[in-house]
């Protein structure tokens, strides 16, 4: 120990003692304030506080912009019906009987290649306890409502142009308006026009204008369940341009601002990863200014853009999984829903060929459902039986557990699994989606979980993030 250290140590000790004394005095004053009349301690809570209300106000003011941004960007699921698929029909092939034709052809495929529950279950590997339930419900669905979401295609699936495309777009509008008048329209219907890339931009805008104008002329208003699909989006600026286009149409016809929403189709690598390394799709959702309703994965265009050979272009390819995972994270909490792509292996030909295609399609749909992609594309009537079989088996297999856990959560009952509010939302959403598509009945769900439909919806779609305490 040096002479300098010996001389300075008493002074340092004295300073430390003074600091300790000031801290004790400060703490005593804080406790006095906390225990003063009118505080929480005086109100019988039995706790003491140190922070004055001004600190709460300061923190609230600091985070007010964040609170507003969370509400704007992440409003949660809209709570509307979610179709289990989107059926694409070329614009020149659409007729007034298209939906009924798809249902009849799907039923005919079952009659020919799986005429009873046992044979259908054997082909797909449906457990015996579910076989009859699933088969009966699939046939009823194909008879009652074979298509939940119809997209009239004026893009890759369409070969017209010029005056022919004008006429087909106008005819599509007349047919859709008529279907809504007579009650035969699908719950969701719309068109996919050409994209906004320079070579086809004007054509796409013209087709969309003809279709929307025709709906107003023949229906008096835009129908409920109207859905537009914007394909081959690579830059967020293309989404902004589409928003401006819809704003102009709404102003022209005196429609409520924001009336027309649309889906963004992810078919290019640039839509997933921008040149600067950021996730473009997240910026696209923001650029949609609240109009985006879905992100649809384009299996074959996206795979081709990455150089995947034709034989390996499928919705379960690792490249597809990566793209959809990015889409899923970008869309989470925004109210924008993610839709899986399609399979181009069609159930046609011999019974053996049909069964092979059915097994493939059924497996892809079940795989997507397990990954929370609750919607996908169907390109052929023969895919409807396996779409609904996969969906119904998924919801019915998880029905008893989901209903029991949600009922236990609602009653705060004990159980083998401790569920949190987020899990309760997922359980309620699972049951509601099952009811909406026909996999479950409202009555059996109410009995199983003890919750009436309105309470079930309240659990499934609380808006605004974390509930207050």
Regions found by a protein language model. Name each.
Residues 2-9, 33, 37-469:
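Expand to "…catalyze enediolate/carbanion chemistry for C-C bond making/breaking, isomerization
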Residues 15-17:
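Compositionally biased, intrinsically disordered low-complexity segments enriched in Pro/Arg/Gln/His
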Residues 23-27:
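Low-complexity repeat regions of mature extracellularly deployed or surface/particle-associated proteins
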